[in-house]
Structure formats: structure tokens, C-alpha cells
Amino acid sequence: MNGPPDRVDFKPMGPHHGGSFRPMGFAYDDGFRPMGPNGGVGGEGTRSIVGARYNYPAKYPPSESPDRRRFIGKAMESDYSVRPTTPPVQQPLSGQKRGYPISDHGSFTGTDVSDRSSTVKLFVGSVPRTATEEEIRPYFEQHGNVLEVALIKDKRTGQQQGCCFVKYATSKDADRAIRALHNQITLPGGTGPVQVRYADGERERIGTLEFKLFVGSLNKQATEKEVEEIFLQFGHVEDVYLMRDEYRQSRGCGFVKYSSKETAMAAIDGLNGTYTMRGCNQPLIVRFAEPKRPKPGESREMAPPVGLGSGPRFQASGPRPTSNFGDSSGDVSHTNPWRPATSRNVGPPSNTGIRGAGSDFSPKPGQATLPSNQGGPLGGYGVPPLNPLPVPGVSSSATLQQQNRAAGQHITPLKKPLHSPQGLPLPLRPQTNFPGAQAPLQNPYAYSSQLPTSQLPPQQNISRATAPQTPLNINLRPTTVSSATVQFPPRSQQQPLQKMQHPPSELAQLLSQQTQSLQATFQSSQQAISQLQQQVQSMQQPNQNLPLSQNGRAGKQQWAGSAIPRVASTTGSTPVSYVQTAAPAVSQSVGSVKCTWTEHTSPDGFKYYYNGLTGESKWEKPEEMIVFEREQQKQQQHQEKPTIQQSQTQLQPLQQQPQQVQQQYQGQQLQQPFYSSLYPTPGASHNTQYPSLPVGQNSQFPMSGIGQNAQDYARTHIPVGAASMNDISRTQQSRQSPQELMWKNKA
């Protein structure tokens, strides 16, 4: 408001003074007083506004004419109009971003209102972070009137972002600067030429259209200059931008801008699918790129790199970055850098959790897995076994394990996940199921690291941690008895074993316990013991000179109550001569049952049955083999209970009295031959003598010197029935020999 507090700006208008309002009628007796340019009183006369008559006193102060105190309304006439007013004094707006010099008459000295709409903002990239406005402005002032140079800085740190905006007064100046500076000059301290282009939205604002083309299948070694030369033949190229990754390497695609649609169409017709760059094997892909507005505040040089193919100004959207140019269909889509393809039929073994490769595979529903008796280190990665073809009388799982151990594949027991194999899908479990069978071991000489070929509910208390605890047996002579001779104790007797398997500190006890669980395997082998006794005299002389360490005695001491010693607890050397008589014992223990069918596992993890005499293979279990297994099971059921009870009760005393057990072995003439009979040497035959070889010190590879020939031995094993055997009744009669030894050791 102008004037004192008791006054207002409006005054009665005089008839002779021009002002802001045109007279509205012919009665000049009252009205508004015109305002002068400075906001004061316009003149002495008045002009009345003709309108409705008001009967209340006027609220306006009197003018120079003392008798005028109120408005007098007249009848409104139809010639009402507004005369242009004198321009008021313009004041700078409070919300104005940048001030411009203002003259005394309220006009801009630089660019007036009409000129401001034609100002053009350019984006400049590849600006050194140390550059200042004074260093940048001279390069652009050479090509037009530069109104402003604005360096882009980080809001938090205040550091420059390596780009800036330059505002020109006219679009002609901006176009001239783009043609002269884009990819042409390098600012002091810069690493490459600057990129000069219209800022986002500037072309739309000033009404200048651009025609942008997406170009694919470019040579990744090509530069912007080389790409521009290809497109220059169709018209003036305003901009060339190559998409680059976070290492500033070209991705083989980019964008080319034309100023007219005709030149852009000509480039598409002349290059798309017809022109091939040097060093490329595919023609160029040229098409229109649909523009996409970027997020506010982001530009091509400011967007952070996102994965491969994310050059400046490209943001991650979904599986790949999307450029602000809008066309990303030509971009190479990203994939996970490492996602191993899973095979449908060959999956990780269900009983192993191999983490040596840094991954933890687990069987999934609908994904076939190798059965538990093929849980070698190669099973989880789809690698076929070295000998996928079935060999007569040789378990394929044993062959796998022999080859894996010979190749130096070492699986640490502590890395096995302690999960019960009971959780396997039923169709994927081993398919040898007997009535009342409770053993996961059915091949006493050729079992793998996991051992079971028959898994029933009573076995759920045996975790995978026990699987790699029988390493030496991997190198044993494989026989055609793939099942029916080994049984684990009943479920009630496996409860104590379960509790001792989890603590890693009790691995030694785990090894011994699993040994005891295998004792029933060789109790039915009466011919094996008798053969040992016959060969004692012939082998005793050379064996007397062979050293046996105390740990080796501990392994033999375990023989006093079982048939399989725990070599994992031996760190000494065991001569190979101890292993010479296993083949005759094995053949004779098997020959009493006339079964020529053996169970094997294919490389895909499926069970099949092979006839060693006829060479026939079947997927279904033969009736002959079922009868064979039942007969063996009946024999084992009579032998199982007393043997396991004795083995569990004497476990601790056996480990504490190696010297006493050694003497007892000498008294029973079972010292060296009995120990060796169950560890046949690869390639061993009935009457072959071998020089002594030390057993490996690593408990996981107790017979590494022998295991190297496991593959060759598997092809030369002794078939079923190679050694004759007599009636089964002698087996029952000779059972008391090892049992008496166990009771003596306990005492």
C-alpha cells in the first residue's frame, strides 16, 4: 500500500487525466482516480464508474475536490473495456534461480522475456574434476554468447562429478558449439575429449526435433570418430555415443543422432543388415531409438555403472540396464556370471555334501540323484565314472571309489552334512530290500565310501558322518556278493552308535564302531578261516621278518572281535603280504551259494543286475538273486545278535590292550594271515606272493599304494565260484573260533 495508513490507493478519477481505467459512462461526477507510474495520485479530475447506485457513504478519502465523498453508481453501459496500463515497476522474483541485470524501466539487460525462451542448455561430459568455470568458459565463448557455466557437484561431498552445463543465448550458438567441440577438444587435466550435447529435455522445450538411431553389432575396438565416418555419408551427424561397461570398454552398440528424419531414414536403409564393420562377422543393426526421459537430476555421464554394459546414463532396470535413449532391445542381456547347469539325471549324491568346490548341493524333488552307494566325489558334478561299463563280478560303486581314491580325491569326514539318508525320496534309494534287513552294507569287499546298498527304516540312526569312515575297504577285492552277507545291528543296538557319531572329537571311536558293525560279515565265512589256517605255515616264515607297528596291532586286535579291522586307526605300515590270501577266502565264502547275479549302479544312478556267466543285464531283480539273498539273510540272523553284542562290549578293552591281543593272535596262529585275508591286494590270485608295501599314513587313504591299481584289479577279479566250497553247515561249526577270541580279549 502507498500512502498513510488512513488512505488507500484508489482515488476518484478526473475526466482529463489518463489512467488505468477507461471512463465507463458520461457522468463524470465520481469514480476512481487514476494512478501514476509511481503509484501516486494521477491527477485532479475524476472519472466515474457507471454502475449500480449505492446508498451508503463512500469509504474512499476525498480527492482534491472537497465535495466528493462517495461513489455514485450509474446504470452500467455496454461499452465497458479495459485500456492497457502503464507497465509497473518490475521487481526480481523471490523464486528466481538466477538474477539478471534489470534496468530502471524494469527490462532485462541481457535477454528479455521473449529471448529467454530461446536459451539453450548444453550438457558437457568428460570434464576434469579439478576444472573451474574460468577454465571452461573460454572454450565455449568462442562459439556464442555464454550465459552461464554450472559445474555439477555431489550434494554430500561437494566434489565435482566430471560434467557441467553451459547455457547459450540462442540455439544457433549451441549448435555451433556442439559441432566444434563435441569429441574435438580435451580440457586441461582431462583424460579424453569432452562430449557436448543438448541437455535432457532441451530439444523438446525449444521445439527442435532430433532423430536418434540405435546401432548394434559395432566393432568393440571402434571409436566414436570411426562410427561417425560411417554415418556421415547420409547427412550431418549431431552426436555419436558408444555404450561402455564399467571398465570403459565398448559394448559393441551405441546411438547416432541426426537432425532430420530424411537422413536418419537414409542411414537405416543404407546400413541396416547390409553393412558390416571391419573385424565383425555380423552386419550392423540400425533402427530408430525411442527416447525415454531420464530420472530428474541424472544424465548420461552421471549415472553410476551397473554391471556389464552400463555406460554413463544407463540405469539398471530388470535384468539389464536401460538407457535414457530408450532403446535397449539391442543390448546384450546379462546372465548370472556362474550358474552351473544341473543335469536332469545326474545330480549330487544324496549321501555326500561335498563342499570342496565351494558349493553345497542337495537333492531336490524331481531331480534324480546318484544312489547312496555311489557317493564319490565325482558324483555331484555329473562326471561319469572312469569305467562306466559293468564288469562281471565288480560293483560299479566300488569301481568309482577305487578310481576316485587313486586319483587323490580326498573327502574329509567332518565336511559331510550330518543328515540321515532316510530323507531320500523312496524311488531314489537303493533297491535291494530284504525282509528284516537292517544293513546298509551288502557288498563286503567292494563297497563305496557310503557303503549301503540296502537302506531300510532301521538305518535312520546312521548318519552320513559314518560314511567315509571305512576308507581302506575301497581297495578291497570286489566280489560278486553285492548283497546279503553284511548286516548292521538292530535298531535298538544302533542307538549308542548314533550318539557318538556327531562329535568330531570321537572320529576314532566312530571308525572303530563302524568296524564292529561289520563283524557279522565274515562270521559266515568258515572256509575263509580254514583257508587261513592252512596257509599260516606257508606264510609264517616270510611274514616273521615284516614289521608291524603298534597301531597295526591295534588294527589286528580289532580283528579279534570282528572280521574287518579299522585301518583308519593305523598310522604305521602294513605289509602287502598280509593281503595275499583274501582272494581264496572270498571265493570260497561265496561259492557255497550258487548265485551268478550281481547288483550294480549305472553312471546315471540307477540300479541294474548283471549275470557274470551269461553276460545278461536286467533292470529288475532276478528271482534267483532274491532267493540267494534270503538264504544269506537267514544265516546272518542267527549270527548277528551275539556278534554285535560282543563287539560293542569289547570295543574299549580292545583299544587298550594291543600287546595282549598280539600275543593272543600268535597263540591262535591268526596273527598275520587272518589280518591279511580280509584285505586282498589288487590283482591278487590264489597262490601269488607279493613283496611288502607300506600302507599309506593317511587314514582316509590307508592303502594308497595299492589303490592306484584298483581299476586294473577290478577287471581281473576272481569270478564267483572260482574256488570250490562245501556245505554251509561247516560255517556254523567254525563260528566259535573268532567268538572265543573276543571273549578272551574281553577278559
Curated annotation (Swiss-Prot):
Induction: Negative feedback mediated by FCA itself. It holds the Pfam family RRM_1. Keywords: Developmental protein, Differentiation, Flowering, Nucleus, Repeat, RNA-binding. GO terms for cellular component: nucleus. Residues 591-624 form the WW domain. Residues 120-201, 211-291 form the RRM domain. Constitutively expressed, but the negative feedback maintains the active isoform a low level throughout much of the plant, except in meristematic cells at a specific time in development. GO terms for biological process: cell differentiation; flower development. Gene3D superfamilies: 2.20.70.10, 3.30.70.330. It comes from the Eukaryota. GO terms for molecular function: RNA binding. Residues 448-460, 642-673 have a biased composition (Low complexity). It is found in: Nucleus. Interacts (via C-terminus) with SWI3B and (via WW domain) with FY (via PPLPP motifs). The WW domain is required for autoregulation of FCA expression. Plays a major role in the promotion of the transition of the vegetative meristem to reproductive development. Plays a role in the regulation of flowering time in the autonomous flowering pathway by decreasing FLOWERING LOCUS C mRNA levels. Required for RNA-mediated chromatin silencing of a range of loci in the genome. Cotranscriptionally recognizes aberrant RNA and marks it for silencing. Controls alternative cleavage and polyadenylation on pre-mRNAs and antisense RNAs. Acts redundantly with FPA to prevent the expression of distally polyadenylated antisense RNAs at the FLC locus. While FCA requires both FY and FLD, FPA requires FLD but not FY to repress FLC. This is Flowering time control protein FCA. It comes from Arabidopsis thaliana (Mouse-ear cress). The gene is FCA.
